[in-house]
Amino acid sequence: MSARRLARLEWRDYCNRVSKQLEGQKAELEVVGLDLGDHVEARWIPLYGLVYEPEGDIFEIALEGIDHLIAHPTDLLVEETLRGLVTIEVIAADDTHQILRLREPLPLPVPLR
């Protein structure tokens, strides 16, 4: 199992596509950074969705009661297993890692060829 890095041009479409399926899924959000240490910002609460706005270069993770914004993200990584999507990681310009874990893997559609 390894994370796959998405090209920046894919971010908006990917977020739009998976957000429809993610809505209501239980998720945990962990933030890891040199200045912050390692802490869990949200523990197994409903996820509303993911948004990337290229105009402002802002990535948003919307959870119940939390609107987590990441300014100037540099990388978006997704971890997928045979059961589906399990983790989404957003790395900010200051090298802070936002790690979103899904309680249950999200089944993904078979890619068209």
What is the role of each PLM region?
Residues 23-32:
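A short, Trp-centered hydrophobic/proline-enriched beta-strand micro-motif
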Residues 46-87:
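Amphipathic protein-protein interaction modules
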Residues 72-113:
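Helix-rich interaction surfaces within compact, conserved domain-sized segments
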Residues 36-46:
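Short coil-to-beta-strand transition motifs
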Residues 32-34, 65-66, 91-95:
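Short, flexible beta-strand-to-coil junctions
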Residues 30, 62-64, 100:
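Extended, low-complexity, amphipathic alpha-helical coiled-coil/linker regions that act as scaffolds
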Residues 1, 29, 112-113:
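Mixed-charge (acidic/basic) macromolecular-recognition segments
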Residues 2-23:
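N-terminal leader/targeting segments and the immediate start of mature chains
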